Amino acid sequence: MKTKITSISSLLLIALFANCENKNKSNQSTAETTKETKTTNQDSARVNGTTCDITISGIHFTKSVNGADTLATADANGKVTFKAGAKKDYFCDPNEKLSNNTAPILLSKIDNKKPFTLISKVTPEFTKEGLYNAGVLYIYVNDNFWQKLCFEQDERGKHRVVSVRTIGTSDDNNHDIVTTPSIYMKISSDTQTIASYYSYDKKDWHMVRLYKNNYPSEIWVGISNQCPVDKGSLSYFEDLSLVQNSVTDFRMGN
């Protein structure tokens, strides 16, 4: 009889242990699923900012990042004056020392399954103390996935075309030096390829950057002004346009 009781007790202990182990696995699985869900939500196409309703030169801007809707104004001819306060930049530094995501950006949502071209004449306010001052065109997916094309002041006081692509962290590419106060800048996609260009006359284009369009079906494009070091600046955008076609020659930009 004693042997039978001992056997039954052993079986009960084994069953209880197995049940506890299954519960632990279930709880662990639930926790992992929750963690994955949170991570997925954090990595979704989230854009910081607020909803706005601004139309400039036929472009409907519906997202304002860092108060851009209060800092960009357009005259009757569509010329945009874009203010930026002191130390406003947008850059995800690889070592995080220079990360700063405070620059104002005005964004318009577009269908990335269709070709598009964003163009503007850009005139930044360059000053002696205005290191990295720039007028900027953007492609924007979320806060950690974007590209900007800048007409920017460099460390030697030169003015040049600069491109930055961010996938988690930002790269930083200095391109040609520009000696005129204004240039035309363009970002174009045929749905497969995206390229960035600049021009002095809106006729002869110089390619700056080209890569595969691996952005999702809906993205944002827009304009911005940045002033990472100085006390504030202005940038001007003229002849702003957004059309549903792409360049036909990606090397020449026409």
Language-model features, listed with the residues they occupy:
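C-terminal motif of bacterial Sec signal peptides marking the signal peptidase cleavage site
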Residues: 16-19
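Hydrophobic helical h-region of N-terminal Sec-dependent signal peptides
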Residues: 10-13
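Bacterial signal peptide processing site
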Residues: 21-23
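Extracellular glycan-recognition regions
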Residues: 25-254
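Bacterial N-terminal signal peptides that target proteins for export
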Residues: 1-8
